[in-house]
Amino acid sequence: MLTLNTRINSADKVSAQLVLPYESRENSRLRTALSSGEEVAIFIPRGTVLRHNDLLMGDDGRVVQIVAARESTYRITCANPHDLLRCAFHLGNRHTQTQVGEGFLRIARDNVLKEMLEGLGATVIEEDAQFEPEAGAYGSGGHHHHGESSQGHAHGPLAPIPVHQKIHRPSDIPSR
């Protein structure tokens, strides 16, 4: 089985594609299959989120391109930027993973959130689309500490996320 364990910035040749929904692209340990059907294991640093067109190199030197799968989403638009900002605020207040586009927001389908957004005056359209939510203020690109105390270390205006913080996903709601 091919093991993909190194993220690279560019490659002369891409050997295969791996189509994954966002939820799978959040996993740093995953067993799945390439578009060709070949089984692969992803073993990358914890906390890494794979994005559309990312490249991973396998233990045999082959390069695999990540492709964001089309998923069941809602595309949210509003009559004006102020109303769209209000919708973004309420989604963020509920820790909902949200993709921010030019004049629209996109979230995974969730009927409760759809009703809330429509109540705020938004137009909510179901669509199958690639889902690329924002990494957030605490997402990749930040830094971490190896065993050192954070006392006396300023993080600027952003506070660390509490350990018990919950991110809302539609799959978190138990079915009846």
Swiss-Prot record:
Coiled coil: none annotated. The keyword Transmembrane helix does not apply. GO terms for biological process: protein folding; protein-containing complex assembly; urea metabolic process. It is found in: Cytoplasm. Keywords: Chaperone, Cytoplasm, Nickel, Nickel insertion. InterPro entries: UreE, UreE_C_dom, UreE_N, UreE_N_sf. Residues 134-176 are annotated as: Disordered. GO terms for molecular function: nickel cation binding; unfolded protein binding. GO terms for cellular component: cytoplasm. Belongs to the UreE family. This is Urease accessory protein UreE. The lineage of its organism: Bacteria, Pseudomonadati, Pseudomonadota, Betaproteobacteria, Nitrosomonadales.
